[in-house]
Amino acid sequence: MKRLVCFMVAAAMLLSLAACAPTTQPNDPANTNAGNTNDPAQPGDTTVTPADGEVSGDYLVWNIGVESKSFDPQINTSSAGGNIIFNIYDGLVRDTVDGIEMATAESYEVSANAEGVENTVYTFKLRKDAKWSDGQSVTAKDFEYAWKRACSPELASTYAFLVNDYIKGAREYFSGTGSRDDVCVKALDDYTLQVELIQPTAYFLNLVSFFTYMPCREDVASTGEGWDKDPAKCISNGPFYLAEYKIGSHVLLKKNENYWNKDNVKLAGVKGLFITDATTSLQGYEAGEIQITGMLPGEEIPRLLAEDPNFTSEPSLGLVYIAYNMDANLVNDINVRKALSLAIDRKLICDQVLRNGAVPAAALVAPGFKLSTGESMRAMDEYGNVMTEYEINPNGAEVEKAREYLAAAGYPNGEGFPELDLLYYEKGSNSQIAEALQQMWKENLGINVKLKVEEFATYANTINSGNFTITIYDWGADYNDPMSMLSLFSATGMNDSRWRYKEYAGVPDDTTLNPENKPYDDAIIMASKTMGTERDGYLKEAEDVLMNNMVICPLYYTISTQVVDHSRVSGPGRTPIGMWDFRNFTMIGK
């Protein structure tokens, strides 16, 4: 998912973890419930602390670092929003470090469809004690509504492909060639949900654990835009619920007393801060005001690694890369794309700019993803380092080759090459990375690059409209399978590189077609239909097509760095895709 950062906020304001007003206004009818303590899990109840925004010692304070555009499970695309959703909603299952475990569902069965194709029909039995935060029962109809909502043409969700590519009838509904009733998700009764897949999918339960598949109540979503961030309207079914939201400041998540597993939830709640300045974030932690933050200054990483036992750094299933707009002039030439890619010293970026243990990348799929054999898709040396692939040397620039490709494109030594705009958004080390790329391309290729930075809301609109040439982009896995990365570039995937061989209803303005995408799509389709080593072959084939066409320019595989104050908090950490799961956290000490 996109790692999104929206707003930079004044350090002085953010350091004072002070009281702020809730989003409901004094004259808002929803505010009439603010003092109601009869139902301790009532949405809109902001009496959780002595003053709005203040928290007691039983609240964990966590710097989210980002203010997501949405907390709506079917609309959100960011890890920031995903972290909120994972803690206020409960899907049918959860993906944990120990594997898939039951959540709102207490059991499931897998069977054949009417044509006799095995492993295509999943039947989930829901817990009868699962409740929404307002006390209503969670039913199979809530999941049916949510999953059909995710693929509805009216919602036009960016993540519709996570449903369209797997559930029978969903793609047709989304494209307008079918109806809502054609989507093969059905509540057989209040506590039984049945879904039929297009073909067997080995990782379907991993998909179901993702936030796009979380439940949503029709009467809640139909209240209009903005319900997901309004504490008076946002009704959820997870271990916590949204008690308070202050733009530019924080969210308060309060323990949901109607949660089916509430007895094992030890926190009174979580305060999530929107501090995007890494120095301010670290200062808050070192002052004892923040227990968890991953927003850390790159220059401080060596010190933290050497001195702070609360600091951890571990590989994650993500990639930072340059996305080429395959329909844009200049970079629609593969020689230009290869020249730009080979002229980059990735090791220098990792060692001197990031300094956080990030791994130079030579392809799309991170080393942590495994094939059916347990092996990585990456070529690794005897020390576990990524090796050269697709002509990309992860340990240095291939300057001579890069210049040859640029000359083949008609720009020897960069002569006549137009000024190139490099777009990025405000986040962490993005500016330093952009400046390093600008310098490398000038020194190694003789071309001029103009840096263009936007705050995230503007950036998202720019990318969605296709109004860019190249951009620094990042993606973290939505589920623990190589397809989580590879499916992005299918004709019906998110595909912000706009590399499609056929038009797609989800991006109606992307009408410039790229025929070389078809063999990629063919391999993706076959990888979806097959299992084991046969599937492994198609996954590799798809990545080969993508990288041989240099649709993206890999920079580095992401690393998860954070500090967790173990003198104040105890907990198991993150899910396999890097989401914080606070259900089992406990505050210790004072």
Label each PLM-derived region with a short phrase.
Residues C20-P29:
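Bacterial lipoprotein signal-peptidase II cleavage site
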Residues V61, T139-A146, D190-E196, G238-P239, ...:
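Alpha-helical secondary-structure segments
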Residues N63-E115, I235:
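N-terminal lobe/hinge region of extracytoplasmic solute-binding protein
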Residues D98, E172, R180-D182, D190-Y191, ...:
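Gly/Pro-rich hinge or "lid" segments in bacterial periplasmic/extracellular proteins
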Residues S107-L162, A287, L330-N332:
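Aromatic- and charge-enriched surface segment that lines or borders ligand/interaction sites
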Residues A243-K254, K271-A328, D351-V353:
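Extracellular/periplasmic solute-recognition and catalytic clefts
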Residues K254, N332-Q439, E443, E541, ...:
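Append "and occasionally in soluble cytosolic enzymes with long acidic Gly/Pro-rich linkers
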Residues A343-E375, G428-Q438, I463-K590:
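Detector for C-terminal structural segments
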